[in-house]
C-alpha cells in the first residue's frame, strides 16, 4: 500500500477486510460485560473492573507525553491522501447570494474565512454517498440542524474547520458523517496501522456518546472504532487498538498512555477532531493536546468544535489549523439557550434543601420528567444524594471519584428514567448527552458564567423547552452582574434581590426542611447490587417513596 491515491470506493471495505467485526461497545465502557448474566444490577459489575483506578476521577495530568518523540515531518515523502469530497448540489448553486444570506440570518449563522461553501437546506443537498444518506434517514431526522447545514459542506470540502455552537446543536453528526466519508476514501488499514480518524474529547462520558453516534452511522461501512479513556482497565482498549480501528475516540491522558506504551500510533491520522476544545483547555489538557497533535502529520484535516470562543481557544486554532473556515451559530457573546426558562432564587445555604424538595415535588408530578442537580463539590453531591434517597427520592449521583462502571450504570438508570433524578458535579456538565432532561437545578452556583451556560444547556435540547432553577447565595455575589446580563439577554425575570446584588453585592437567608414524593413499587432502590457502589448510591430508599 504505497500510495494513498483517490477514488477508493466503499465497496472495497468489504468482508475480506473486516470479517464482519465491529467493536461497537465492546471496549470497556461499562456495558459489554456489565449487564450480561448478572441478574439485574448485582453480578454484572462485580468483576473485571477492580483495578480501574476510578478514584482518581480520570486521566493523570502529571508529565504525560514526556516519552513521545518529536516528529520530523517531510511532507514530500508522506503518502498522498484524499480529503476533498464536496460537490455543490445544483439547487445550492442556483440560490442567489441574498437567499443564502437570509438563510444564514434566519438560523443566526455567521461565517468567516476564504471561500466558505454555501449552506445546504436538506440532507440530499449535502452530497453524502447513498450509504451515509440511508443511515441518516433511517434515524428519522427531518432536516439538518443549523450547524449541520453549514458544517457539512465545510467539513466535506477537506478544509480545516472551526465550529462554535451551543451544546445540543447537533455538532457530533456534523463531524461524524464527513469522517465516515473520509475513511471510506482511504486505503484499508494494514497490520500495525493506527486509526485514520482521531476524536479528542474532554470527558469519558462525552467520548462514549460520540462512540454511540459513530457506531450507529458507521455500521453499514463496517467502520471499527474504540473508545480510549481512563478509569477502566486498559486491556479491552489495547485489544481493540491492536486489532485495528479506523476511528479512535479518546480523552487526552489515556491516549498518551497508549502512545507511550507503543499500543498505537497516529501515523495514519488524516482527520482530527477536537471536540469541546474550550472544555479541554478548562480542564488543563492543553499540554497533552499539543503533544498528541505533534504526532500527527501536519497536512491532516482538522475540525475544532467549541461552545465558546475565548482567546485560548483562538490561539489553539491558530496553532493547529491552516487557512481555516469558521461557522458560529448564535451570538458570540455569552448567552443562554432561549428555549430554557431560567429561575434564579436568592437563598441562604440553610434554605437550599427545603427549596430543592419543594421544586422536586412539583417537577416529579409529571412522571416523564428528568431532573439533573448540580453541586459544587463531590462531597455535597454524595450528601445530597444520600439525603434524597433516605427521604424516598430515587436519586443517584455521578462524579469523578466514582469508578467508571458505577458512572455508566448511574447514567443508564437516568437515561432510561428508572432514576429520574441525577446529582452531578461539573464533570457531567458537558460530557453527558441525555436529550430529554426537562429540568436542571443548580444547587450550588458554578465558579463562572461559562459553566452556568453549559450546565443549564443540559436541558432544552434538540428544539425542546426546558427549565433551569438556580440557587444563588451571597457567596456568589461577585458573579451577580454576569448572571443578570445573561438573564436580561434571554428576557428572563430577575429576582429583585439578585439585581440588588449585581449593584451592591447584597443577599438574604432562611431555614431547612423536608417534602413528599409518591411511590414506584418494585424498584428496589440502592439494595441488592453486590456492594460494588459507593455509599451515596447504595443508600436505601426511605419508607415514604416519593415517586
UniProtKB/Swiss-Prot annotation:
Q: Output the InterPro entries linked to this UniProt entry.
A: DEAD/DEAH_box_helicase_dom, Helicase_ATP-bd, Helicase_C-like, P-loop_NTPase, RNA-helicase_DEAD-box_CS, RNA_helicase_DEAD_Q_motif
Motif: Q motif; annotated at: 121-149
* Hydrolase found in the keyword field: yes
The biased composition feature labelled Gly residues covers: 509-531
Q: Name one GO molecular function term.
A: ATP hydrolysis activity
Q: Which residues form the Helicase ATP-binding domain?
A: 152-327
Entry comment, domain topic: The Q motif is unique to and characteristic of the DEAD box family of RNA helicases and controls ATP binding and hydrolysis.
State the function annotated in the UniProt record.
ATP-dependent RNA helicase involved nonsense-mediated mRNA decay and ribosome biogenesis through rRNA processing.
Query: What protein am I looking at?
Result: ATP-dependent RNA helicase dbp2
| Organism of derivation | Aspergillus fumigatus (strain ATCC MYA-4609 / CBS 101355 / FGSC A1100 / Af293) (Neosartorya fumigata)
Q: Which gene encodes it?
A: dbp2
Amino acid at each position: 500500500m504505497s500510495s494513498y491515491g483517490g477514488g477508493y470506493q466503499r465497496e472495497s471495505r468489504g468482508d475480506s477486510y473486516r470479517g464482519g467485526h465491529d467493536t461497537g461497545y465492546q471496549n470497556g465502557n461499562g456495558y459489554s460485560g456489565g449487564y450480561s448474566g448478572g441478574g439485574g444490577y448485582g453480578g454484572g459489575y462485580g468483576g473485571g473492573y477492580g483495578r480501574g483506578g476510578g478514584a482518581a476521577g480520570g486521566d493523570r495530568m502529571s508529565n504525560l507525553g514526556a516519552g513521545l518523540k518529536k516528529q520530523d515531518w517531510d511532507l514530500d515523502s508522506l503518502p498522498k491522501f484524499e480529503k476533498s469530497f464536496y460537490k455543490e448540489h445544483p439547487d445550492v448553486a442556483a440560490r442567489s447570494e441574498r437567499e443564502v444570506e437570509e438563510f444564514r440570518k434566519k438560523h443566526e449563522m455567521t461565517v468567516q474565512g476564504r471561500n466558505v461553501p454555501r449552506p445546504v437546506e436538506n440532507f440530499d443537498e449535502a452530497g453524502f454517498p447513498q450509504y451515509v444518506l440511508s443511515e441518516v434517514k433511517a434515524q428519522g431526522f427531518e432536516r439538518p440542524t443549523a450547524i449541520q447545514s453549514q458544517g457539512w459542506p465545510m467539513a466535506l470540502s477537506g478544509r480545516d474547520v472551526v465550529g462554535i455552537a451551543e451544546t445540543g446543536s447537533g455538532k457530533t453528526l456534523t463531524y461524524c458523517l464527513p469522517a465516515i466519508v473520509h475513511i471510506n476514501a482511504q486505503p484499508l488499514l494494514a497490520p500495525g496501522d493506527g486509526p485514520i480518524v482521531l476524536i479528542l474529547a474532554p470527558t469519558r462520558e462525552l467520548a462514549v456518546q460520540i462512540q454511540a453516534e459513530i457506531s450507529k452511522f458507521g455500521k453499514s461501512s463496517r467502520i471499527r472504532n474504540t473508545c480510549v479513556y481512563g478509569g477502566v482497565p486498559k486491556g479491552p482498549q489495547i485489544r481493540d487498538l491492536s486489532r485495528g480501528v479506523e476511528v479512535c475516540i479518546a480523552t487526552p491522558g489515556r491516549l498518551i498512555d497508549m502512545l507511550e506504551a507503543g499500543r498505537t500510533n497516529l501515523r495514519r491520522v488524516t482527520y482530527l477532531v477536537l471536540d469541546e476544545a474550550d472544555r479541554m483547555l478548562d480542564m488543563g489538557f492543553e499540554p497533552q493536546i499539543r503533544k498528541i497533535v505533534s504526532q500527527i502529520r501536519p497536512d491532516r484535516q482538522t475540525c475544532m468544535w467549541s461552545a465558546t470562543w475565548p482567546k485560548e481557544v483562538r490561539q489553539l486554532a491558530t496553532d493547529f489549523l491552516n487557512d481555516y473556515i469558521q461557522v458560529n451559530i448564535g451570538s458570540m457573546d455569552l448567552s443562554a439557550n432561549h428555549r430554557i426558562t431560567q429561575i434564579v432564587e436568592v437563598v441562604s445555604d440553610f434554605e437550599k434543601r427545603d427549596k430543592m424538595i419543594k421544586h422536586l415535588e412539583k417537577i416529579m408530578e409529571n412522571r416523564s420528567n428528568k431532573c439533573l442537580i448540580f453541586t459544587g463539590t463531590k462531597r455535597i453531591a454524595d450528601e445530597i444524594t444520600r439525603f434524597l434517597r433516605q427521604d424516598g427520592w430515587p436519586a443517584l449521583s455521578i462524579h469523578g471519584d466514582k469508578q467508571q462502571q458505577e458512572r455508566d450504570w448511574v447514567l443508564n438508570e437516568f437515561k432510561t428514567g428508572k432514576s429520574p433524578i441525577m446529582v452531578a458535579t461539573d464533570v457531567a456538565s458537558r460530557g453527558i448527552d441525555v436529550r430529554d432532561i426537562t429540568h436542571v437545578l443548580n444547587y450550588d452556583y458554578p465558579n463562572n458564567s461559562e459553566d452556568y451556560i453549559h450546565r443549564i444547556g443540559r436541558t432544552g435540547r434538540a428544539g425542546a423547552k426546558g427549565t433551569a432553577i438556580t440557587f444563588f447565595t451571597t457567596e456568589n455575589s461577585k458573579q451577580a452582574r454576569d448572571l443578570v446580563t445573561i438573564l436580561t439577554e434571554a428576557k428572563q425575570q430577575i429576582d429583585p434581590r439578585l439585581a440588588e446584588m449585581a449593584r451592591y453585592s447584597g443577599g438574604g437567608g432562611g431555614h431547612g426542611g423536608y417534602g413528599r414524593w409518591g411511590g414506584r413499587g418494585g424498584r428496589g432502590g440502592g439494595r441488592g447490587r453486590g456492594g460494588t457502589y459507593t455509599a451515596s448510591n447504595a443508600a436505601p430508599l426511605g419508607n415514604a417513596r416519593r415517586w
